[in-house]
């Protein structure tokens, strides 16, 4: 039944989805579990790290050099490896009573206490096994017991150290794992950052290692150090910002995510102002959304939505998260020729495979295509709500107001300055913590008040444009793109000004020449200077030689396709020219997670185990594919691929240019290019 039979909305019945069958192969025999499986042994057997002398070590300490480090733990082998970020010289500590390996515990203790160390998940794991390693009388078996307790049983590391009656080490270290959203594995990060070698742990945890396997593990450990250094270098500006901003509040922010920074600073401010150390306060039951007075609509559809939100009960589940009201499920709000999804997660338009351009077929400019982003959107809505997290108390409002005002002031002085960037992190991170049940910022009514008010404000803008006869081509959580005849520029500006007066918010406009949208989250927009803005699938990733905090959030997926599309849209470069003129293999690779581990299989060749993170490119000479080792599921996009876990500095001669050209053609259609040329 259609929604519009009983009300003002409709929800067209969706086509029946046919379940897409997973392509399943029979996994090969797991030769990689055999005792004689020795990957990279020829290199590892005689390899020795270039170690620092004691004099060099003291000099490095006096210079303030930083060391990246890692540990490896097996029942009969434990090691810790350190690499000087500045010089590349190393330290290694190994223990295996079975093979007569031991180390100077006092020296390891000195290193741990006298350097700034850089690690990946060191706060949860490495620092604790190292604390046990320096305790007199411990050996590899004890460190492995600790490893099992931390990793397999989930016991907090500090508790494991206590159980072993070991001494907690006072360490100065930077844990990189929290600096990238969703905390991807080091192996995935290596793929995003064009590591020369992506290598998974070569031997199953719990294996009693042979001498040959130990040589491989130590070689592998220093490859992990190289990859950790890649992440450190990619995050250097973020770390530098945290180092400069943290002391202003007396807080160490170096290992914290953006949201964690917001919480740490609020904790510090509350302690300073009230003497309290706030703790999370749970929220149970339900609550109502408080409709802002400024939210007003003229169309019956949006008036209906407004009333539904006034009447709705927002229920907090047993897990502490807000449940979507029933009326929001599958809701699509029609305004003009567009439908919009609406809910706690945000507002999104539903366009598919559509392009817009300001010129007609004769090359005459006929339209304005203007993107309007809301400035300081959620921070302003948080302040306007008047709500505060109970754990923080009323002090939240003046603290947040001061941070907001200081940010506005500093942004005018130096938008890239420490204060401006640091306060931006605090403002944006605050909202994320309002929905976290384990945070002192937790308060579901504040989260809902912020996100729903924001969506209603955007609906007010969309409605105004629609009633004025203009077209909204796209809208998401914090902005809208409006298309109108070029002679109506003044009308559009008047609409925006009227909206700003009604809501108290401010729009930041940006004009486009054209937009090409696969959907609301994946598109390429060309601005008035013919520079491209790429989002979603088309967004650049960390393999482009300019890694930053945005680009390392995304796995590489044949980035050459997005590059070729950008060159075609902005400069008219032929697709084939873009493909064949690129000699950077990073632009052609795809990096993916392979559940449980991936293996490359090709008729007539032995299987090659790749690991849980795989990297490959389309090969004109390959008949192989990558499948998961347990269930034989095909890793998507790997048919006819060639794995390239290691770079040798040479561009492959078998790149399948036809495959990539077909991908570009497919995405031209997905981006709606043919809607411009029809």
Residue positions per predicted region:
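N-terminal accessory regions of nucleic-acid-interacting proteins
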Residues: 2-69
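Two-metal-ion RNase H-like nuclease active-site motif
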Residues: 64-73, 174-175, 370-372
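Conserved DEDDh/DEDDy metal-dependent 3′-5′ exonuclease domain
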Residues: 66, 77-79, 85-188, 220
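Acidic, Mg2+-coordinating catalytic module of metal-dependent nucleases/exonucleases
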Residues: 118, 177-269, 285-288, 477-480
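Helical catalytic core of nucleic-acid polymerases
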Residues: 171, 177-186, 194-212, 329-461, ...
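Acidic catalytic cores of enzymes that act on phosphate-bearing nucleotides/polynucleotides
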Residues: 233-368
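C-terminal, non-catalytic extensions of nucleic-acid polymerases
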Residues: 420, 455, 489-678
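Short beta-strand-to-loop capping motifs
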Residues: 481-487
